[in-house]
C-alpha cells in the first residue's frame, strides 16, 4: 500500500510539467507559422532601382526622394504580399474619399461607347502649368474603385486634372452599346480618352498612369505609334506583368497561391461578362451558345480568354491573342520618361516576368525600374503597426515622380531638348 502511494506521488507532479511542455511547443509552432506567413523577419529596404547614369535620372531621384527611402509597410501584416493584396482586393483603400467628377461618353466606330470620368484640379500646380493625369485602371476596374478615388483625390490636391478610363463593360450601371468589352491590351478606348483631352485642353501636358492591366494598356498605347507620345511628359506603370504569354504558365501554378488568385479573377470576369449577356450573346453577336456554356464552367482567366475575350478582335488562338495584346512587343518604342514599379511579393506577377522591365531599364536611358520588397499587388499600404494610412506609398510615388518631371520640363538645360545634339557629358557639365 505504501509502495503504491509512493509511486502515485512521484508520478503526479511530472504530469503538469509534461503538459506545459506540450503547450509551449504548440505556442511556439503557432508563432513560427505566424512569423513565416506574415513574413515578419523580412527587412524593410528602399526600392531596388535599375536605371542608367543620366542627368535626368539623377534629377528625378534627387527630386523624388521617396524612391530612395525605405518603404515601411504596417508592422504586423504589411510584409505579407497576400495580406496587402487581399486588403486591396477587398477594401481597395481605407477611408477612401469621394472626388467629384463629370462622366464623358465617347462613341466608337464599331458602335461601342467609351466612358471616362473627368476630375478638375483642386489647387494650382506648383509648376504653374496645366497638367492632366490620364489614368487606366486594373482589370475590370473603373473610376469608382476605392484605390482610384484615393489616387485621384491626392492628385487633384497637388494640382492635377485627372481623366480616368472606365473599362468597357466594367461599370455596373452602364450598358454596352455593341457586342464588345475591354480586353487585355485593346487601346481603343484609352486612345479616344487621350484624344479628347488633347483636343479639349490644347495647352495641357499629359502624365500617363496605368495600374496592373492598365499598365499594359498604357505602355502598349505609347509604343504603338510615336504620335501617341506627343505632349506626354512621362508614364508610370504599377504592378503589370508585361507579357501575358509568359504569365500564362505561372498563373496555372500553385506557387504563391497563384492558381487560387486565377480562379478568383476568373470568377469576377464571369460576373462582368454575364452582366452583359444580352448584348454579348444576343442578336448580331459573334458568340454562340456553346461559348456561353464553356464560360459557366471556366475556372481560369486563360479559359475565359480563349473562349470569349480573344474573339472580340478576331484572334485565331490564345497564343496570338496574348502576343498581340502584350506591351512587351511595344514598350521598347517608348521614348518619354518611363517609371515601372513592381513588388517582389506580388502574388500575381511571377518574379521571372521582372526580367523584362529590368532589362529594359538597363538598355534604355529613359526607363527607371523600381522594385520594392513588399507591397503585394496594388497594395503598398503604409502604417505604424496595425492600421494602414488612407494614402499609400504607390499614390505618393506616382505624384512625386510626375511633379519632378514637371519641374524638369520647366528648368531642363538646353542640351536636354529634343532637338539638341549635345552629348551627355556636356549636359552634365552645364548642370553641375
Swiss-Prot record:
<feature type="topological domain" description="Cytoplasmic">
    <location>
        <begin position="1"/>
        <end position="14"/>
    </location>
</feature>
<dbReference type="InterPro" id="IPR012020">
    <property type="entry name" value="ABHD4"/>
</dbReference>
<dbReference type="Pfam" id="PF00561">
    <property type="entry name" value="Abhydrolase_1"/>
</dbReference>
<dbReference type="GO" id="GO:0051793">
    <property type="term" value="P:medium-chain fatty acid catabolic process"/>
</dbReference>
<feature type="active site" description="Nucleophile">
    <location>
        <position position="212"/>
    </location>
</feature>
<dbReference type="InterPro" id="IPR050960">
    <property type="entry name" value="AB_hydrolase_4_sf"/>
</dbReference>
<protein>
    <recommendedName>
        <fullName>Monoacylglycerol lipase ABHD2</fullName>
        <ecNumber>3.1.1.23</ecNumber>
        <ecNumber>3.1.1.6</ecNumber>
        <ecNumber>3.1.1.79</ecNumber>
    </recommendedName>
</protein>
<feature type="active site" description="Charge relay system">
    <location>
        <position position="377"/>
    </location>
</feature>
<dbReference type="InterPro" id="IPR029058">
    <property type="entry name" value="AB_hydrolase_fold"/>
</dbReference>
<keyword id="KW-1003">Cell membrane</keyword>
<keyword id="KW-0325">Glycoprotein</keyword>
<keyword id="KW-0472">Membrane</keyword>
<dbReference type="GO" id="GO:0046464">
    <property type="term" value="P:acylglycerol catabolic process"/>
</dbReference>
<dbReference type="GO" id="GO:0032570">
    <property type="term" value="P:response to progesterone"/>
</dbReference>
<dbReference type="GO" id="GO:0003707">
    <property type="term" value="F:nuclear steroid receptor activity"/>
</dbReference>
<keyword id="KW-0443">Lipid metabolism</keyword>
<comment type="similarity">
    <text>Belongs to the AB hydrolase superfamily. AB hydrolase 4 family.</text>
</comment>
<keyword id="KW-1133">Transmembrane helix</keyword>
<feature type="compositionally biased region" description="Polar residues">
    <location>
        <begin position="418"/>
        <end position="432"/>
    </location>
</feature>
<feature type="glycosylation site" description="N-linked (GlcNAc...) asparagine">
    <location>
        <position position="225"/>
    </location>
</feature>
<keyword id="KW-0719">Serine esterase</keyword>
<feature type="glycosylation site" description="N-linked (GlcNAc...) asparagine">
    <location>
        <position position="423"/>
    </location>
</feature>
<feature type="glycosylation site" description="N-linked (GlcNAc...) asparagine">
    <location>
        <position position="141"/>
    </location>
</feature>
<dbReference type="GO" id="GO:0008126">
    <property type="term" value="F:acetylesterase activity"/>
</dbReference>
<dbReference type="GO" id="GO:0097524">
    <property type="term" value="C:sperm plasma membrane"/>
</dbReference>
<feature type="region of interest" description="Disordered">
    <location>
        <begin position="413"/>
        <end position="432"/>
    </location>
</feature>
<feature type="topological domain" description="Extracellular">
    <location>
        <begin position="36"/>
        <end position="432"/>
    </location>
</feature>
<keyword id="KW-0735">Signal-anchor</keyword>
<feature type="active site" description="Charge relay system">
    <location>
        <position position="346"/>
    </location>
</feature>
<dbReference type="GO" id="GO:0004806">
    <property type="term" value="F:triacylglycerol lipase activity"/>
</dbReference>
<comment type="function">
    <text>Progesterone-dependent acylglycerol lipase that catalyzes hydrolysis of endocannabinoid arachidonoylglycerol (AG) from cell membrane. Acts as a progesterone receptor: progesterone-binding activates the acylglycerol lipase activity, mediating degradation of 1-arachidonoylglycerol (1AG) and 2-arachidonoylglycerol (2AG) to glycerol and arachidonic acid (AA). Also displays an ester hydrolase activity against acetyl ester, butanoate ester and hexadecanoate ester.</text>
</comment>
<keyword id="KW-0378">Hydrolase</keyword>
<dbReference type="GO" id="GO:0036126">
    <property type="term" value="C:sperm flagellum"/>
</dbReference>
<keyword id="KW-0442">Lipid degradation</keyword>
<dbReference type="GO" id="GO:0120516">
    <property type="term" value="F:diacylglycerol lipase activity"/>
</dbReference>
<dbReference type="GO" id="GO:0043401">
    <property type="term" value="P:steroid hormone receptor signaling pathway"/>
</dbReference>
<keyword id="KW-0812">Transmembrane</keyword>
<dbReference type="GO" id="GO:0042562">
    <property type="term" value="F:hormone binding"/>
</dbReference>
<feature type="transmembrane region" description="Helical; Signal-anchor for type II membrane protein">
    <location>
        <begin position="15"/>
        <end position="35"/>
    </location>
</feature>
<dbReference type="GO" id="GO:0047372">
    <property type="term" value="F:monoacylglycerol lipase activity"/>
</dbReference>
<feature type="domain" description="AB hydrolase-1">
    <location>
        <begin position="132"/>
        <end position="383"/>
    </location>
</feature>
<dbReference type="GO" id="GO:0051792">
    <property type="term" value="P:medium-chain fatty acid biosynthetic process"/>
</dbReference>
Amino acid at each position: 500500500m505504501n509502495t503504491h502511494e509512493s509511486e502515485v506521488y512521484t508520478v503526479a507532479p511530472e504530469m503538469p510539467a509534461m503538459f506545459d511542455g506540450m503547450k509551449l511547443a504548440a505556442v511556439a509552432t503557432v508563432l513560427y507559422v505566424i512569423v513565416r506567413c506574415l513574413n515578419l523577419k523580412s527587412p524593410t529596404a528602399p526600392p531596388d532601382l535599375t536605371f542608367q547614369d543620366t542627368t535626368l535620372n539623377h534629377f528625378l531621384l534627387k527630386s523624388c526622394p521617396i524612391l530612395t527611402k525605405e518603404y515601411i509597410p504596417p508592422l504586423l501584416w504589411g510584409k505579407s504580399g497576400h495580406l496587402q493584396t487581399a486588403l486591396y482586393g477587398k477594401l481597395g483603400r481605407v477611408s477612401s474619399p469621394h472626388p467629384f467628377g463629370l462622366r464623358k461618353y465617347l462613341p466608337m466606330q464599331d458602335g461601342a461607347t467609351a466612358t471616362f470620368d473627368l476630375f478638375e484640379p483642386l489647387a494650382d500646380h506648383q509648376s504653374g502649368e496645366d497638367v492632366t493625369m490620364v489614368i487606366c485602371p486594373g482589370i475590370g476596374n473603373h473610376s469608382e474603385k476605392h484605390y482610384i478615388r484615393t489616387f485621384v483625390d491626392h492628385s487633384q490636391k497637388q494640382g492635377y486634372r485627372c481623366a480616368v478610363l472606365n473599362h468597357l463593360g466594367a461599370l455596373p450601371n452602364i450598358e454596352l452599346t455593341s457586342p464588345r468589352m475591354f480586353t487585355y491590351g485593346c487601346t481603343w478606348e484609352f486612345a479616344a480618352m487621350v484624344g479628347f483631352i488633347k483636343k479639349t485642353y490644347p495647352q495641357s501636358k499629359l502624365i500617363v498612369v496605368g495600374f496592373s492591366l492598365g499598365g499594359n494598356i498604357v505602355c502598349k498605347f505609347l509604343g504603338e505609334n510615336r504620335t501617341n507620345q506627343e505632349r506626354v511628359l512621362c508614364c508610370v506603370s504599377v504592378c503589370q506583368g508585361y507579357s501575358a504569354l509568359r504569365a500564362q504558365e505561372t498563373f496555372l501554378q500553385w506557387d504563391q497561391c497563384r492558381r487560387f488568385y486565377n480562379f478568383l479573377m476568373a470568377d469576377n470576369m464571369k460576373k462582368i461578362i454575364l452582366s452583359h449577356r444580352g448584348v454579348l450573346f444576343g442578336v448580331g453577336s459573334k458568340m454562340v451558345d456553346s461559348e456561353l456554356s464553356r464560360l459557366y464552367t471556366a475556372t481560369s482567366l486563360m479559359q475565359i480568354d480563349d473562349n470569349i475575350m480573344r474573339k472580340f478582335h478576331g484572334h485565331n488562338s490564345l497564343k496570338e491573342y496574348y502576343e498581340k495584346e502584350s506591351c512587351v512587343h511595344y514598350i521598347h518604342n517608348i521614348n518619354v520618361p518611363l517609371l515601372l514599379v513592381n513588388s517582389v511579393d506580388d502574388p500575381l506577377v511571377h518574379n521571372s516576368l521582372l526580367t523584362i522591365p529590368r532589362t529594359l531599364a538597363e538598355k534604355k536611358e529613359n526607363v527607371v525600374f523600381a522594385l520594392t520588397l513588399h507591397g503585394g499587388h496594388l497594395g503598398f499600404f503604409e502604417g505604424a503597426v496595425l492600421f494602414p494610412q488612407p494614402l499609400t506609398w504607390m499614390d505618393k510615388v506616382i505624384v512625386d515622380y510626375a511633379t519632378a518631371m514637371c519641374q524638369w520640363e520647366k528648368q531642363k538645360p538646353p542640351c536636354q531638348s529634343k532637338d539638341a545634339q549635345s552629348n551627355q557629358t556636356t549636359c552634365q557639365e552645364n548642370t553641375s
